[in-house]
């Protein structure tokens, strides 16, 4: 039965009419630049981020994601810049996204800034069909592997934020790119992997429950054609601006426990464990995600305390 499930997962990632989605993160709130270019430079300091995520541990061919990024404001200007790399491995596919982000911010009120962002992405897709067990060995459509198939893309984002509140709307990939069409030139719409538009909305607010305790509920919704609407709800508490603990729920998919520690003024480490709430939980032992963030507090408007997002 487990092999059947594995085959089903691999089919979802490779066969006809697959609506491709962006890599999934539970701790997205610490690296929002991956989904919204307007986030670049919004923390007021250079921020370096790394992530490793192993999804559905124990299930062959399950997603493994590695990500790294750096973003910073440019001196006293309203400009922010960022660069990010995401590697996503699922079954026979190995995909790399290299992105450059640009943001421009305007002061809309005494408390709020509105940032506009642009993203340019280079996608490199590799698919090794020899890792699949073919139902029809004579199907020559899968005879040749895909090697570093290049696809460019662009994205946009808006980010309204203050010291304790944020809202964001973004589409990191606007171009609906067909990475590989096995019937190219015949007029068929059958394809192996198609990049559909992913639309994101995020929101969050930090409540000061006491001098040493902060509470932050947050929301992420993601829409992509051909896939169910994704809704992520999370609630995190920060103690003494050092320790973070919280819970998250991905609608009809999983529940998560999140912990974090601000080791120094610059270093933050976070961990999340996801447990499936679907029948898939019978075939894996959960998902693990660890993040590491390093920040240089050498900006013109140095933050008095670590920001919660």
Where are these regions (language model features)?
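N-terminal signal peptide c-region/cleavage motif recognized by signal peptidases
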Residues: 14-16
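Subset of outer-membrane beta-barrel
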Residues: 20-309
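Sec-dependent signal peptide recognition
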Residues: 2-8
């Amino acid at each position: 039965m487990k092999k059947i499930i594995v085959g089903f997962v691999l089919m979802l990632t490779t066969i006809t009419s697959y609506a491709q989605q962006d890599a999934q993160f539970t701790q997205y709130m610490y690296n929002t630049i991956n989904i919204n270019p307007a986030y670049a430079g919004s923390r007021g300091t250079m921020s370096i981020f790394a992530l490793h995520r192993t999804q559905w541990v124990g299930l062959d061919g399950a997603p493994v994601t590695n990500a790294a990024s750096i973003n910073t404001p440019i001196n006293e200007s309203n400009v922010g810049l960022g660069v990010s790399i995401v590697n996503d491995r699922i079954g026979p596919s190995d995909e790399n996204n290299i992105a450059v982000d640009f943001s421009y911010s305007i002061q809309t009120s005494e408390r709020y800034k509105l940032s506009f962002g642009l993203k340019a992405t280079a996608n490199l897709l590799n698919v090794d069909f020899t890792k699949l067990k073919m139902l029809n060995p004579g199907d020559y459509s899968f005879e040749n592997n895909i090697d570093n198939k290049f696809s460019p893309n662009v994205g946009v984002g808006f980010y309204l934020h203050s010291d304790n509140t944020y809202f964001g709307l973004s589409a990191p990939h606007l171009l609906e790119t067909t990475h590989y069409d096995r019937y190219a030139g015949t007029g068929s719409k059958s394809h192996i992997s198609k990049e559909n538009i992913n639309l994101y909305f995020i929101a969050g607010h930090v409540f000061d429950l006491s001098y040493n305790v902060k509470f932050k509920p947050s929301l992420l919704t993601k829409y992509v054609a051909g896939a169910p609407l994704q809704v992520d709800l999370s609630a995190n508490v920060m103690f003494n601006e050092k320790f973070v603990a919280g819970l998250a729920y991905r609608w009809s998919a999983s529940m998560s426990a999140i912990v974090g520690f601000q080791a120094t003024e610059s270093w933050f480490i976070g961990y999340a464990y996801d447990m499936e709430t679907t029948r898939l939980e019978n075939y894996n032992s959960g998902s693990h995600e660890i993040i590491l963030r390093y920040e240089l507090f050498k900006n013109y408007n140095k933050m008095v305390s670590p920001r919660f997002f």
